[in-house]
């Protein structure tokens, strides 16, 4: 009798526990997205961002800068080891991060009329140890495309080729998981934009051969280690690049940037054809899409945020069409239209936008249905979490208008106050928001 009584109690308690674990109650969350989200939005250069931080600091999440190999490379050992001093780049990252922003970086060799290497116009950013080699010979154009004096890296030089690959290996090893860096843009030619407008293209001299370009793309895919990397949409041009005719390269998950976005002839013209050729309408699903508002006309940057649109198209329309995650618009605040509030609105028209459509808990677990109501996916890992307990399902890659079901091995509070999105890819000052209305 005593044994039977004990068994009865055990079964009764077990029944209560099973009943408890199967009782799911709604979590009455009420959240709003209040501003641009990390790794998205309109972008300023550091000088502009620094000067406008009081008024525009909350309107942006990203800043852009070119990065010069000659500023971080001190030399090369006899065994081929590149000697670096990253302090210049570290100062740049720290400056941007001090405003709660992340960097979009682009390495380049050529910049027509650029003086940021040595104060002289058009000097390449090739490291000095390569320039001092007897087998390295740069070429020069006095005014290609009307952009001013330009020197060109010597792509016949095998050490330049080797160094270029090694630079990205070493850079990605050091910075791929650094939260101060959001995205990396790469390429060749003027501004690394995959063209030499106004100058004659000479493979293996002023531009890398298609064979080396292929090697470079495959190398980037190998070393990026989760860091989203982008190339110019101009890489779709068969004159310069092998990409669109190479199935293996087209299958890589690189993103795209367009540095003359929304110019007068953009739609239906060369730029849109480039997007279609190299993007195929689906590249945005795995690769970040961004760029810079056009400088073709002085009004392009200053008026693209006009509610009436620019050349018949609004910013919101174009951001949606091309699934834009970020866009440089450094001169926009000087035009009168792009107030801090309008800049904030423009930033919020890009990227991802997470919405919790349903959330419930049984006290020990939480499950929710999450949708992306933005124009692009998130390209780096982030997770919903209850307290310190993360979901095993990353939000990375959730496409616009798609939903996913997420479970977390912890119980949410009744109001969901302990539910957040966490990511190792954002700064401590940043927070990925989500919207949720009481269910």
List where the protein language model places each region.
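Bacterial N-terminal signal peptides that target proteins for export
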Residues: 1-7
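Hydrophobic h-region of N-terminal signal peptides that target proteins for export
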Residues: 11-20
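N-terminal substrate-binding region of glycoside hydrolase catalytic domains
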Residues: 22-159, 282-320, 324-338
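Catalytic-core regions of glycoside hydrolase
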Residues: 24-51, 97-99, 183-333
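Conserved, mostly hydrophobic/aromatic
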Residues: 63, 96, 171, 184, ...
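Active-site groove signature of glycoside hydrolases
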Residues: 136-160, 164-206
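Extracellular/luminal regions of secreted and cell-surface proteins that mediate adhesion/ECM remodeling
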Residues: 348-439
């Amino acid at each position: 009798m005593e044994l039977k009584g004990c068994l009865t109690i055990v079964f009764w308690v077990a029944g209560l526990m099973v009943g408890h674990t199967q009782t799911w109650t709604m979590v009455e969350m009420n959240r709003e997205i209040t501003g641009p989200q990390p790794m998205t939005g309109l972008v300023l250069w550091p000088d502009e961002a620094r000067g406008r931080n009081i008024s525009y600091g909350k309107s942006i999440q990203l800043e852009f800068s070119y990065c010069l190999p000659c500023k971080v490379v001190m030399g090369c050992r006899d065994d081929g080891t590149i000697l670096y001093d990253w302090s210049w780049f570290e100062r740049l990252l720290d400056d941007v991060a001090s405003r709660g922003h992340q960097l979009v970086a682009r390495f380049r060799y050529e910049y027509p009329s650029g003086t940021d290497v040595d104060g002289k116009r058009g000097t390449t950013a090739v490291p000095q140890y390569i320039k001092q080699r007897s087998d390295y010979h740069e070429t020069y154009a006095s005014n290609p495309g009307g952009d001013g004096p330009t020197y060109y890296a010597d792509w016949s030089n095998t050490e330049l080729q080797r160094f270029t690959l090694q630079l990205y290996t070493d850079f990605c090893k050091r910075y791929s998981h650094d939260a101060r860096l959001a995205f990396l843009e790469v390429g060749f030619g003027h501004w690394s934009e995959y063209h030499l407008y106004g100058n004659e293209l000479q493979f293996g001299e002023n531009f890398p051969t298609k064979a080396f370009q292929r090697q470079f793309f495959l190398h980037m895919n190998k070393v990026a280690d989760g860091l989203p990397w982008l190339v110019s949409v101009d890489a779709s041009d068969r004159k310069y690049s092998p990409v669109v005719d190479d199935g293996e390269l087209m299958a890589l998950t690189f993103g795209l940037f367009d540095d003359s976005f929304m110019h007068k002839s953009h739609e239906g013209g060369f730029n849109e054809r480039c997007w279609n050729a190299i993007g195929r309408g689906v590249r945005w699903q795995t690769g970040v899409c961004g760029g810079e508002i056009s400088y073709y006309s002085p009004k392009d940057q200053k008026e693209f945020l006009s509610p009436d649109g620019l050349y018949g198209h609004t910013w919101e329309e174009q951001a949606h069409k091309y699934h834009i995650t970020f866009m440089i618009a450094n001169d926009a605040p000087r035009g009168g239209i792009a107030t801090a509030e309008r800049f904030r609105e423009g930033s919020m028209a890009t990227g991802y936008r997470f919405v919790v459509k349903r959330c419930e808990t049984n006290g020990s677990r939480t499950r929710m249905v999450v949708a992306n109501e933005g124009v692009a996916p998130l390209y780096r890992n982030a997770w919903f979490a209850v307290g310190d307990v993360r979901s095993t399902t990353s939000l990375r890659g959730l496409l616009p208008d798609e939903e996913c079901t997420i479970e977390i091995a912890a119980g949410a509070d009744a109001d969901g106050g302990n539910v957040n999105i966490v990511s190792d890819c954002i700064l401590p000052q940043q927070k990925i928001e989500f919207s949720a209305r009481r269910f």
